[in-house]
Amino acid sequence: MPGVKLTTQAYCKMVLHGAKYPHCAVNGLLVAERQRPRKEHPPGAGNHTLFVDCIPLFHGTLALTPMLEVALTLIDSWCKDNSYVIAGYYQANERVKDASPNQVAEKVASRIAEGFSDAALIMVDNAKFTMDCAAPTIHVYEQHENRWRCRDPHHDYCEDWPEAQRISASLLDSRSYETLVDFDNHLDDIRSDWTNPEINKAVLHLC
C-alpha cells in the first residue's frame, strides 16, 4: 500500500469533530484528489495517498444505518463533482483509552476499499488529545489480506505536522469546533453545510 498523508485541513477537521463532541464517538470520511489511472507505478517512486479533506459524518451512536447509506451516496456525488474520491474513514471511540477499530469501523472502511483499493482506516487516539495538540492523535490502518492492520505508529502521517499542530491548537483556542457541521447536524437542518466552508477558510487564513 502506498504511503498516507493528511493535509492540515483534513487533520484539523478531524480534531475539531472530536473536540465538539468529547463524550461521544465520532466518525467521518477522508477524500483524496481523483487520479488518472496508471498502468504502472515505478518502484520507489514515493507514491502516496494524500487526504485533502475530511467530511465529518456522525456523533453518538455509530452504526451501519440507512442514514450512512444516504451520506455515502451524497458525498460520493459531491466528490465526483469536485474531482475527489472517498479514500478513507476515520473514527474516534467513546472511551478515552479505546483507540482500536471496532466492527463498524472495519466494515465501513472495507466498503470504501471496494471503490478505492488503497483506502486507509484512521483511528483517533483520544488519550493523546490535548488543547495544544502537542502530538499527532492518529493511528493509521491498512487492509492486508482482508484484515485491517496498524501501520508504523511512529511515522509522521501529516503533510506538514508543525503547521497542522499550530493551526489545530489555534482553532481549538478560538473554539472553532462549535461551528463545525457534521452530517448529523445537516440532517437536523439541511441549511447546515457539511463541507464546512468557514472552517476551510479559517485554516487557509492561518496557513
UniProtKB/Swiss-Prot annotation:
Main location: endoplasmic reticulum
Native source species: Rattus norvegicus
Protein name: ER membrane protein complex subunit 8
Keywords: Endoplasmic reticulum, Membrane
GO CC aspect terms: cytoplasm; EMC complex; Golgi apparatus
Compartment(s): Endoplasmic reticulum membrane
Molecular function as annotated in GO: membrane insertase activity
Pfam name, any one: UPF0172
Quaternary structure, from the entry: Component of the ER membrane protein complex (EMC). EMC8 and EMC9 are mutually exclusive subunits of the EMC complex.
Membrane topology: Peripheral membrane protein
Family of the protein in this entry: Belongs to the EMC8/EMC9 family.
